[in-house]
Structure formats: structure tokens, C-alpha cells
């Protein structure tokens, strides 16, 4: 509720009644009728902006007009009238209040002195009926400053500098019905200050500095219907009956204060109250009988407080309640029978609340409920009889599908197929490759296996999207809490971490061999196997630790439909947040920095050697080829990881990140490395291209011989892959053959780099 909305309180003339035509059509659970025809449509087709019924019935009454907001349109014009430059509309333009200050405007019996730098209440004819003194410099209201205005009905004193009001300031205003004191500096109201305002219906004192009130403060307000004290600094309400001198009070707005609790006696005399707004306070405790006297209450707003526990029967006397807001409270648990007595409830807001024990039983008694609001759209499946449930999506999934976007539903299969095919192809072709360095081949196969897991992960997500197609919301919560989701999420993290660590290992091997060619020792079989095993063990530990302690990590992988824990700081435990940051901004960021630094150093080393080794004439061309290859390796790593680092960092800063980001990252960004690694590290290397050319040449030769009837003996399909250290003949590595050591270094570097170009 904003400060401007206070003017909507004109609607407080009586309690509204919502009339709805009876429906003879009976629909099954989760389906709702199309007006007066026999057709029924599922919940997800109602209020979706499309005329699915054919008679617009599914798009009617979609707005949440429960509570007093039902009267919004009726009094919308009045709101603008009261907040416009000329708030009055007298029947005659002629001024009937005698002489007025030069800067003021007058029409009929209404006086407008807004923004005229007045420092005191002007003296005009006593027959004035409305007076607006907004945006002036009035600091005090002395005794009897309005005593002559017996006919005054509306008094506007907003946006002045009023700090004190005399107990006799409003004496004589026997006809006043509306008093606005908003946006001033009032710190205290003396008991009896409103004693003469027997006809006052609206009292608006929002955005002041009031720190305490008591029942005597409102003595004399026998006709008051609306009391607005929002955005003050009240820390507590009196332990005595607050409405003792306001028997007709219908609307009490205390939003935006610092109230810590509500006591049983406070509201005991407010039996006519129909709207109670207590949002944005610091209420942390409620007694079971707090609202017992409010049997006519129609709307209750307790949103954005610090309530942790709700007594089971706290709402048992609120049988007329139609709108309840409990949003953004740290409520630990909602009882299964919490709402059983709210038989007329039509709108329930539970946004921002993690309902760990959610079940259909909670909402089944609410047969008149038409609107419900949750923190997670998956919760909507537990209220299938409610026509409108929000949110409809978390940006990743929708009520209908695990993957909300058609683009995502298509490309999850395309990306997974490309990823799996590329990596499986490289793995399967290894038996046909005679490699002098089995250890390098072993590392590449290990990398392909890790990347292939990412393709499998995407296949599984696509498969469950197909399984739940059209009715995902029925299965959403169970899916995210299921073992399948936990395992598939672990698979994605396993693939990611093993791939990152393997790329770092391969990069460091290249870095040492190229930058320090004479110190490079051929990696032994035992060392390589040990490193690979340690990398996989580390990946398994990182991926599966969150499954070992549910209390510490909560539902780590089940924060969204794709089971990937990229950013979910709003639902994670502190331990899970630290763990997630350690993975994405710890291990992965460090690995990315190492890779970028290593490739930069490798290229710089080759370039520096070429400056002094004039014997190598084609070095510039080789450098360009090398630079291009290194650029694409670093570029794909950056393309994959920089967006993830940015998203994770922004989530730590509490920046709101659209849910769609996660699905796009998981389907299009995260698999980039997994899909391109086979291309960058195998399919575009010189040995592979030479093997393809050789195979094609042999195929053409064999075909030519066959056409001539000659017998051919083509070499088998074998790719001879050379480890960089083995490509130079031993006799060429003798130092005596080179004038300068750097020449030998360059030859060695050039030879090593041939396998990467």
C-alpha cells in the first residue's frame, strides 16, 4: 500500500458484498467452467490472455478485486480529484467566501491555498466548506486557529512543516468530516486534540514522526471510519482498547511502523473493524486470541513482518475474512488446519514463504478461494481448486512444461545430441588410432567422458520435460524433491568440475612443455593415471557432498526444474551458499584464470623466441595459426564461464536475477565447452586433419584401382598421433647444432606447437 492509496479510503462507506452467479456446471478437480456453458478448462488455460472458452469466460474476473480493492474503480475519479492541482469542484465558479489571500484560488465555498508560502492559517469567511493548505510553511497549529470555520467539512494540511498541534487547534470544527495531516513532522498528539471533531470520518496522519498513541488521543472521534497512521515510528500499541473512543472505526492502517507485537486488549473494542493493515512492521509474536474480537474483519494484512510461528487457531473467529496477506514473513511452519475456519476467504497471499510441509489438506477447506500467491509456482499444484495461482512460472518452468520456452524445449535435444555425438565419436575412434603417447590419449578420452555426462544430463532433462508435458505443475514439487532430480543435478556438477579440472591439467602440461622446453619431463604413466583418478574423485566428492547432509544443504539441487544450483541464495542455507560460491567463484574461477594466463604465456614465449631466431622463416605464419587456436580455446572458456561468474556474483549482491537466466545458462552456455572440446582438442588438430586427408586419398586410390580391376592394399584406418616431446629426432636436439640456446628452444617450441595448429 503506497501513501497515495490512502485516498482510496473513500470507499469506506459500508462493507461490500461479492455476488457471484451460481454455476450448474460441475468440473473435475483442477478444471473450471466456461461461464454458463458445459465446457470445462484446466486451471492453466484460465486467465492466460487467450480466449480458450470461446465466450471470454475464462478471461473474466481474473483480477484480484477481493477486499476493499473491489471499490477501486468506483472511486478512481475521486482520487484524482483530491490530488490534482484544483482539488475542489464547486457548482459555481464565483467566490462566495469574501476576500481571500492574493495567491489563493476560490470557487464557491472552497478555498485552495496550495504552494503559497503561508506560515499560518488564513482568515477568510466562516462559511468556507473546504480548505486546502498543502505544500506551505506552516509549523504550528495554535489554539483556536480554525474556531470560526463551523461549516468546514474538508481540511487539507499535507506537506507542511507542522511539528506541534495545540489541544485546542481544531476547536469549533463541528462539521469537519475529512482531515489530512500527512507528510508533516508531528511527533506527538495530545489526548483530546480531536475532541470537537464529532463528525470526522477520515483521519489521515501518514508519514509523520509519531512514536506513541493511546486511546485518549482519539477522544471525541465517535464518527471516525478511517484511521491511517502508516509510515510513522510507532514501536508499540497501547495495552488498552485502542478503539474505545472510535466505535464506528472500519479501517485501521498501521503499515510501515516499527510495532513489535499485538496484544489481546489492543483490538478488543474494534468489533466493527473490516480492514486491518499491519504490513511492514516488526511483529514477531501473535497470541491465539489476538483477532478474536474482529468478527467482521474482511481484510487482514500482516505481510513483511517477522512472524515465525502462527498459533493453530489464530484465525478461527475471522469467518467473514475474504483477503489474507501473510507474505514475506519467516514463518517456519504452517499447520495443516491453519485456514480451516476461513470459509469465505477469496484471496490468500503466501509469497516469500518456504512451506516445507505444504500439502493439499491446507487449502482444501477454502472452497471460495479464487486467488492464491506463493513463493514458488510449484506450490500452485497443491491448490488445484483455485482458479488463479501465482506465480505461473519461475522463468525456467511453467505450469504446463518443465522447460517453459519452446526454444529451450527444442534446443535441449539439439545441444545434448551434438555434445554426446562429438564426445562419443572421439572416444570410439581411439581404437583406430596408433598413438605413441597413450597418456595424452587417455587424458583426452577422460575429458570426452566428462563432457559426455553433460549431454546425458541434458537428455534426462529433455526426457522428463516430455514426460511432464502439459501437466508439469502436478509433478513439479515431487520432481524437484525426487532422487532423480538430485542425481541428475549431481551428474551436471560432476561433468562440469571434472571437465574444468581436466582442461586445467592439460593446459598446464602444454604450458610447461612450451614455456620451459628443457625442463619438461615426459609425464609418466603412473603420474598421469594418478592425476586423472584424483580429478574424478574430486569431481565425485564435489558433486555428491550436498546429498550427504540434507539439514545442512537443504534441497541443494532441487531449487529449480533443471536441478542445477546456479543461483538460489534466497532459498539456500548459509552452508549451501558458501559451498556454491566455493565451486563457482572458487574452483572454477581459479581454473579459468590459470587457463587464460597459461595460454597467454605460451603465446608470449613463442613470440619472444621468434624475435632472435631468424633461421625460422615461417614463424609469423605459425604464430598466426597458433594465436587463432589459442584464441578460440580461451574464447570458448570465457563464453562458457564468464556469464556464470557474473550471475553468481550478482546473486551474492542480492541483485534480482530473472529465473529465465538459469535455463538459458544450463541449455546454451554451460554445455559450450562440452560440445566444443572434441572439436578444439581433437577434430581440428593437424594429426586428425592429416588422417582425414590420408583416408580420403586412400579411398580415392582404391576406388580408382577397383574401376581398373587392380588389387589394392591400402593402409589401415590409423591416425598416428605424436606427443610433442617425441616429434623431434634426437640428433636435432643436440645443443651443438645451434649457435644460440634460444634457437634450440624455438625449434623445440615450434615442434611442440605443430600438434596444436
From Swiss-Prot:
Glycans are attached at residues 36, 127, 264, 272, 325, 368. This is Relaxin receptor 1. Residues 26-63 form the LDL-receptor class A domain. Its main location: membrane. It comes from Pongo abelii. The chain crosses the membrane at residues 409-429, 444-464, 487-507, 528-548, 578-598, 630-650, 661-681. Disulfide bonds join 27-40, 34-53, 47-62, 485-563. Gene3D superfamilies: Low-density Lipoprotein Receptor, Rhodopsin 7-helix transmembrane proteins, Ribonuclease Inhibitor. One of its GO terms (biological process) is adenylate cyclase-activating G protein-coupled receptor signaling pathway. Keywords: Calcium, Cell membrane, Disulfide bond, G-protein coupled receptor, Glycoprotein, Leucine-rich repeat, Membrane, Metal-binding, Receptor, Repeat, Transducer, Transmembrane, Transmembrane helix.
